[in-house]
Amino acid sequence: RTLIFVHGAGFDHTIWVMPARYFARHGWRVVAVDLPAHGRSQGAALTSIEQLADWLARLIDTVSPNQRASVVGHSMGSLVAMSAAARYAGKVEKLALLGTSAPMPVADVLLNAAKDNDQAAIDMTNTWSHSVGGSLGSSENPGLSNLAVGERLLQQAGPGVFYADLTACNNFKADALELIEQPTLVLIGDEDRMTPARAGLAVVDALHNVQQRRLPGCGHSMLSEQ
């Protein structure tokens, strides 16, 4: 069994350290990817969710050539997972969507700041991504600050990468949802300010074979908060 984790805009594979470790210890072949131009992956940033889904499909051919893979995606990664499931049903077995919304509009003030590689884009994203408790710096991991970790990860993205990601999210159309037949789990943070709970519930309503789980008191950065 192969399980592929896909990160969100501006981030990389390191956000999946704990869940990847868990599933690896429970018999899964785990791949936490760095999308092109993120983390350790080279190349230019891809500018649409469809291009990223094509890239993911090629990755599945490489790591699981004879068997469909399950895909877990957070935020932008959830859009990549949905697009891949809709367009490459023969490659994707199941989905888990965290902090999702379809479409996924991005505020102009954030897009413009990211286009200018302005620190303000990181500050806005970092603040809006956390619940009230999370934005105060609290963490379930002793000695860590959610805000500091999130800021550092976004600062590591190369020039133009965060803007390319946000543009891809902003341009994504929800048409793909009606084509998804794979079993899907949607995780919704009740205090998510980036992809509000109502947006996650709209995705649930649009899918055919779906379960949902609500995370009380959790913001968009659910991987660090819970």
Question: How should these model regions be labeled?
Answer:
Residues G8-F11, S75:
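Active-site glycine-rich loops that stabilize anionic/oxyanionic intermediates
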Residues R193-A199:
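Conserved alpha/beta-hydrolase "acid-adjacent" motif
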Residues R1-G8:
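Short beta-strand element of the alpha/beta-hydrolase
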Residues N112-L179:
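Conserved alpha/beta-hydrolase catalytic His-Asp/Glu region
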Residues L79-M124:
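Flexible "cap/lid" loop of the alpha/beta hydrolase fold
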Residues C218-Q226:
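Catalytic histidine-centered segment of alpha/beta-hydrolase-like enzymes
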Residues V17-R25, R29-M76:
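Active-site loop/oxyanion-hole signature of alpha/beta-hydrolase fold enzymes
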Residues I180, V186-I188, D192:
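Short beta-strand/loop motif that positions the catalytic acidic residue
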